[in-house]
Amino acid sequence: MRDPIEWPTTDLVTHRVSATPDRTATVAVGGDETTYRELDAAVGAVAAALDRRTDSTDPTVAVLLPTRPEVGTLLFAAMRLGATLAPLNVELDAATLRAQCATVEADLLVCAASTRDLAAEAATCPVVSVEDLPVQPDGAGADRETEVTPATLSRTDTQLVVFTSGTTSEPKGVRLTVGNLVASAVASSYRLGVLPTDRWLVCLPTYHMGGLAPFVRSALYGTAVVVQRSFDADATRQAIAEYGVTGVSLVPTMLSRLLDAGWEPPSSLRFVLLGGGPASEPLVERCRERGVPVCPTYGMTETASQIATARPETAFEHAGTVGQPLVFTDVTVVADGEPCDPGERGEIVVDGPTVTPGYLGGAGASFGEFGFRTGDLGYRDADGRLWVEGRVDDRIVTGGENVDASTVAGVIRDHSAVEDAAVVGLPDEEWGQRVAALVVGDVTPAAVREHGAERLAAYEVPKTVRTADALPRTPSGTVDREAVRSRLSAGDSGTERPE
């Protein structure tokens, strides 16, 4: 494991503006462009405004904003002030948000006009609207206070608290340090490459790392972030073309919708970073046929985003891989406490400078001899490429037999009429658990079981099959397995239940 140098010493915009002040920093789709000189002025003014509104010497600023450029301004203002930023999910209910504000011990909650009422109900601290902060580079907004002296940073300082998606459990507040963020940005750019003219489109929520990471990468390298407030297949493909976008982060559902809409990527697009869930082989093949430079990636909040990423040529040549681990990142596949040989499946364990120091609020991170235990199952080949095959706790034990949920889901997805599938175990009085599948596509439960019987052992074939218009997902795009389990248990999809 190798660490990058002990840097930065102050916020990234302070460093960046001294090098390339007139380069474009942010672009709002349908709005204005901002240079790094202008962003630096806004960051300084906002940092002073936050300082005036908080009493703590190391405050935590919670943010309840939809995706917009001001999230980046607030991130760097917090960094300049020496504060911690805690972006909150605007889709959550007030009670959950109140609990998260308490967990992070927020000193101030920044909202938008669209989230003002929710913020007032959820807040455990004073609330200020972003419209009342000097976020605009031209001075629009509230009075501009005297700028603060940039805080001296250490790589161990907690910069962000980001809550997990809650795919398999309650969301946990992940501490991410200055060093975590910079190491992640360096490693990502080392794998993908970076050009001075790069423009990265952000259309993912900025309360998850997929939406936040491009701001850090761009400030580090002096490139631009193009911000779209929400994903829409037609509007997003138009933005990619109109704004000269060279990279974009998407989840599989978004990419599928773009392709379904007939999208042909422009030659300027160099990377489609695809994460938040498994990239199916048919989806990657569609990308190859359309000339989409897809980069399947594996990452998590606890590692400040990417762990491993496949470049397009690797993704096309080695079906299902997420590529080799990024620079600085050590990945060990472990079974029974020992590293696995190539091709042997086990739990994916990650170590390196991108890994969180831990969670807030007493939630324990699982660290072992080889690093952070992700809870994900996978394997590596002899060249170090990684495949991710589901969760350790996705194992279903039915009648004493072990069933791998991801394997069953993969077989179901191979059916020509199936668009997507999720498989979980449901309680069963006779067998302990039974295999259950929620399926998206124009297919009957009987056809799914018949297809499964041709490729799976009898105990692996789903006994419960329901269809749905879409799989329930968390805001970050990952399958919400608890919601899948609830839907299969309750039968709320309105489709038949097998005998």
Regions found by a protein language model. Name each.
Residues 5-9, 22-54, 62-68, 72, ...:
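Conserved AMP-binding/adenylate-forming core of the ANL superfamily
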Residues 114-156, 170:
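ANL superfamily adenylate-forming
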Residues 33-37, 152, 156-186, 480:
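Conserved AMP-binding A3 loop
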Residues 352, 357-358, 377-460, 470, ...:
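AMP-binding/adenylate-forming catalytic core of the ANL superfamily
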Residues 184-199, 206-247, 252, 257-262:
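Conserved AMP-binding/adenylation subdomain of ANL enzymes
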Residues 92-121, 135-137, 184-201, 232-246:
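Conserved ATP-dependent adenylate/AMP-binding module captured primarily in the ANL superfamily
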Residues 270-271, 279-295, 302-386, 392-395, ...:
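Conserved AMP-binding/adenylate-forming
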Residues 4-9, 21-24, 143-163, 168-172, ...:
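Conserved pre-ATP/AMP-binding loop-to-beta segment of ANL
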